[in-house]
Amino acid sequence: MSLFKCTNEATAQRTDIAVYMDVTGVEGVTEVTGEERVYTNCGTAWTSFTESPNAQTKERKFINEKTARNNITRYAPQWAFECLLMYNRPEVRKVYDIVKQRKVGSDTVVTFIVVDLFDKTGTKYAARKVNAAVQISSLDDDDDMIIKGTFYNQGDEILGTFDMTEGVFTASAETPKEESIAENKQAEE
């Protein structure tokens, strides 16, 4: 038997995970020549972005065991968020427009990339592409207006890499590519 000895016990900080939202088509966003999508960092304005994987379980009891077993059967991820209503930020404007225009259904779906800045190869970082419905729970007045809500995942997340230099997400070969609500909506437009 061999033991792994870790000599570097660094802990990821909130600045080690970055979130980039697709803001293609948002008013005032200039598209980069040759790029399909335009992403912007959800940093300034965002005061909270908390992931809850929400593992769903199923309990099984066997007649020969006193203790039940719980198996993970699926996930229902969601992301609680708070951001200041900085209307000059395109990703904030995109979220605010959902509640302002009382959008429903596929019109509430946004795409964002979650990037692990501590997992880098060259200019690419390990990342997940997420399609999520935006549910705004409140617009609070605390001198500054604060948007509070939840992003609810729509389908499976797509694993891949995000090139910080080019702003391009590439799905990994082992991630099955399924059409999402957001992609269907974009194809209709």
Question: Can you annotate each of these PLM segments?
Answer:
Residues 63-129, 159-164:
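Extracellular/virion structural assembly segments
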Residues 98-104, 131-135, 153, 168-173:
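Short, low-complexity, polar/charged sequence segments that are solvent-exposed and flexible
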Residues 161-189:
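Intrinsically disordered, low-complexity terminal/linker regions enriched in Pro/Ser/Gly
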Residues 2-80, 132-145:
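Solvent-exposed edge beta-strands and adjacent loop segments
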Residues 1-5, 186-189:
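Basic/polar N-terminal segments that are highly enriched at the extreme N-terminus
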Residues 44, 113-159:
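Short beta-strand and beta-hairpin "edge-sheet" elements
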Residues 27-30, 36, 45, 107, ...:
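Compositionally biased, intrinsically disordered low-complexity regions
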